A protein has these predicted regions:
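Flexible loop/coil segments at beta-strand boundaries within sensory signal-transduction domains
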Residues: 230-236, 475-481
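Short hydrophobic alpha-helical segments used for membrane anchoring or interfacial signaling
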Residues: 117-123, 131-132, 402-408, 415-418
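Short regulatory alpha-helical segment in sensory/regulatory domains of signaling proteins that mediates
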Residues: 105-117, 203, 389-397, 401-404, ...
Length: 530
């Protein structure tokens, strides 16, 4: 069989199967390099260098990912986009644990005033699937999807208690090859790696005590206490719940003494929730996926890498109630030919994103979260909206902005904006506050009768002579209005009627685009409004 092509993500010491789809492996490599980059952004030349791919290949791969909404192209820079989170969402939905247990974790965090996390095992590491953090000067910086080495965490020994000899061998090989943990970008490098035997002993102790401690193994000051959440049907560890603190608040022994009983009670409630949860109703598969990729290929030609788009589409076939799928089910869900779906499954399995399961089925692995989820899980609503605001301002040639309602409900606060270069333009700075009842965004956010009936608000010269403002609501995935999208202009440039015919359709279209991104980003993650 041929060796893995340059820029693919073949596991160390393995070669890609003959049936593997090379463009799909290369696209996955691009996404992983972007995930590891600061801010989820790299230049095209940096991607060329870090993946080892030809520049023309990088250009086609990123153009395809941009067409899918997974990245954003800004000149020579490539940035991860919120729509990419649909891949991680597929894993989290199929897993069901965040949907069933996150409320318990959030309640525990509120009660203890400490950060609480849920994590699953990922080969020789642990990966976060939920975070309930506290806002403090010293706060937890780990993100959903971050991968940590098992031996430097509290959950690690609890997962290692179920490792096979092959798992332990793989772990020792990894430690020998990377003693400083450079392959785990979420943690600082280990300056003084502990002996392997230390983790073996911690694992044996965790198996006996059914809990584990992290006493500043990741960095000085960080301590954690973990208890396993077991699957009621199998008794195996489904995930691990952890309370994380700082030595300025708790020492590691103090965590065990003061918080272990409450953590155990919360875990018992989680296990009850798993036991009594009704079977999931299978989510309907997304229709027309194969048709969409074919149409995009027709439109863009060789600049659209259809095999990459189809391969990533296979990941989205999984969902709640669709956690284990056969080849036939994947082909039916995506509209792909069986042969195409089969090659995609083989490739995704080689990339450690899929694993075989009983009954000739496949399941997603936690490694799906390595495709952009950690940096994107911290995305705020203004960050989601900003590129859409800029595009809207370019189309209508007027200043655009996003605003939210203050806690008092008496003011609006501008959280994002895009300006034009007109001699006369509305200039409102991010962070500025204005009376809600005197502004179009305020009318929308307050749901005043006329704005609620029309679905938009048009305000003339209430704040300043000559200023005309038009706003529409932005809703989250539950339908709740969370922000207002606004275009402001000088009244002399357009009549009120012209605003409704020329600006309102563009404004509504942009709000729909923001809502689509917000719906994906907010499925399993809290998206801050500011």
């Amino acid at each position: 069989m041929p060796p893995a092509p340059a820029g693919t993500i073949a596991p160390a010491g393995t070669i890609a199967p003959a049936e593997a789809v090379t463009p799909l492996l290369r696209g996955i490599a691009v996404l992983r390099r972007l995930t590891e980059a600061p801010g989820g952004t790299l230049s095209l030349s940096a991607l060329e260098k870090t993946t080892g791919l030809a520049r023309s290949t990088v250009d086609r791969l990123t153009a395809t990912l941009a067409r899918m909404g997974h990245v954003r192209l800004d000149g020579r820079d490539v940035t991860l986009a919120p729509r990419l989170m649909e891949l991680g969402n597929a894993y989290l939905a199929a897993l069901r644990l965040p949907a069933l247990l996150s409320a318990r974790a959030d309640e525990l965090a509120d009660e203890l005033d400490e950060s609480v996390s849920l994590a699953v095992g990922d080969r020789d590491g642990i990966r976060f699937i939920h975070q309930a953090t506290r806002r403090r000067a010293m706060s937890l910086s780990f993100r959903i999807g971050d991968l940590l080495p098992a031996e430097r965490t509290a959950p690690g020994p609890l997962f290692a208690a179920d490792w096979t000899e092959a798992d332990w061998r793989h772990w020792r090989e990894r430690r020998a090859a990377d003693p400083a943990d450079h392959t785990f970008p979420a943690v600082p490098p280990s300056e003084h790696p502990t002996p392997d035997e230390d983790f073996v002993l911690r694992t044996a102790k965790a198996a006996t005590n059914d809990h584990a401690l992290d006493d500043q193994l990741i960095e000085p000051g960080l301590v954690a206490l973990s208890v396993p959440v077991r699957d009621p049907g199998t008794g195996r560890v489904a995930c691990v719940a952890s309370v994380v603190s700082h030595t300025s608040r708790h020492t590691a022994p103090d965590l065990r003494t003061a918080l272990l009983p409450r953590l155990r009670a919360a875990v018992a409630a989680m296990e009850d929730d798993l036991r009594t949860a009704p079977p999931p109703a299978p989510a309907p598969p997304r229709a027309g996926l194969a048709t969409w990729t074919g149409a995009s290929k027709q439109e863009l030609g060789r600049e659209f890498v259809e095999s990459l788009a189809r391969g990533l589409t296979v990941l989205t076939a999984f969902d709640e109630g669709r956690s284990a799928l056969t080849l036939t089910q994947v082909a039916q869900a995506t509209g792909l030919a069986r042969a195409t779906a089969r090659r995609a499954l083989i490739t995704l399995g080689h990339a450690d994103l899929l694993a075989p399961a009983p009954g000739n089925t496949f399941t997603l692995t936690p490694r799906v979260l390595s495709l952009g989820f950690p940096p994107l899980s911290r995305t705020s609503l203004p960050e989601i909206a900003q590129p859409h605001l800029t595009a809207l301002a370019d189309r209508v040639h007027e200043s655009t902005s996003l605003a939210v309602l203050s806690e008092s409900g008496e003011e609006i606060q501008y959280t994002a904006r895009a300006s034009t270069t007109r001699v006369l333009s509305a200039r409102v700075t991010v962070g500025a506050r204005l009376p809600a009842r005197d502004t179009a965004p305020g009318h929308v956010l307050l749901a005043l009768p006329e704005a609620r009936t029309q679905g938009y608000a048009l305000v003339d010269e209430e704040l300043e002579a000559g200023l005309r403002s038009l706003a529409v609501p932005v809703r989250d995935r539950t339908g709740r209005v969370v922000a207002a999208l606004n275009v402001a202009m000088h009244a002399a440039r357009r009549t009120a009627a012209a605003c409704r015919t020329d600006i309102l359709p563009e404004l509504s279209r942009t709000a729909t685009l923001i809502e689509a991104d917000l719906s994906v980003a907010g499925r399993f993650v809290h998206v801050p409004p500011t």
